[in-house]
Design a protein with these regions (language model features):
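Active-site-adjacent betaalpha module
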Residues: 1-35, 69-74, 99-228
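A short alpha/beta connector and helix-capping loop motif
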Residues: 32, 49-82
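Active-site loop/turn elements of alpha/beta-hydrolase fold enzymes
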Residues: 41, 83, 188
Length: 228
């Protein structure tokens, strides 16, 4: 099945034809040494107790556990990103205005000083050997040493998981593509507050920047990498 065929029924045929004409949708696959990039799956964004959470389900978290276990068994690098919880306004930049209470202008972050908000569930969270990237903007490449770390380790491709598909996932995928990393996105292991935004962005990512595949296919792709 071609990339275009898998979207039939969700995307009108006339629109798919324009992508075919433009020669989009070619697969990129994985390179010689992939890493897992887990974006923003801290309690703040996966636990309904936090107002910033929206979209993640038990199936989503099970998918995170599954792909993390595969990378650990293969001894492949795992990277995590989360917000920089240091609360200086200058670090937040325009988030101060975009996420503000209109009447007062106060920044909306009732969990700024809640350490648990920035921790991960232990079932898929980081271990001492993993690298955690702190970020202030949607892309974990922007203003961080992530690219330098990946190059040092010889990483040439990424499996990207996390939240939210239309925001930080998309931003990271586009930046990874811009840095010439091959990217694969397991569709069950990304989530969004909006189903419409989720699927629209997965389609666009699949057409232009990466490969969006079911988890079973991603795990099969990783089968060529052996321990050691």
């Amino acid at each position: 099945m071609s990339k275009l065929d898998r979207w039939r029924g969700q995307i009108p045929d006339a629109e798919l034809a324009t992508y075919a004409k433009g020669m989009f949708a070619h697969p990129v696959g994985l390179g010689r040494y992939p890493a897992l990039l887990n974006i923003d799956t801290t309690y703040m964004f996966v636990d309904p107790a936090y107002p910033q959470c929206g979209g993640p389900t038990d199936d989503f978290q099970a998918a995170l556990v599954a792909i993390t276990d595969v990378f650990r068994k293969l001894d492949l690098p795992i990277y995590y990103s989360r917000r920089d919880d240091r609360a200086q306004p200058v670090r937040r930049g325009l988030w101060n205005e975009k996420l503000a209470i209109p009447a007062t202008g106060a920044f909306i972050d009732s969990y700024a000083h809640d350490p648990r908000a920035d921790e991960w569930p232990p079932s898929y969270g980081p271990r001492p050997q993993d690298c955690v990237i702190l970020k202030n903007k949607p892309s974990c490449f922007f203003g961080t040493p992530l690219e330098s770390f990946l190059r040092y380790q010889g990483v040439d491709s990424l499996v990207v998981v996390g939240v939210a598909t239309s925001g930080c996932i998309r931003a990271a995928v586009v930046d990874a593509f811009s840095h010439n990393f091959r990217v694969v996105v397991p569709e069950e292991a990304v989530s969004d507050r909006s189903a419409a935004a989720h699927w629209a962005n997965l389609f666009d990512i699949d057409m232009k920047y990466a490969d969006v595949k079911p988890m079973r296919e991603v795990i099969k792709m990783l089968g060529k990498f052996s321990v050691g």
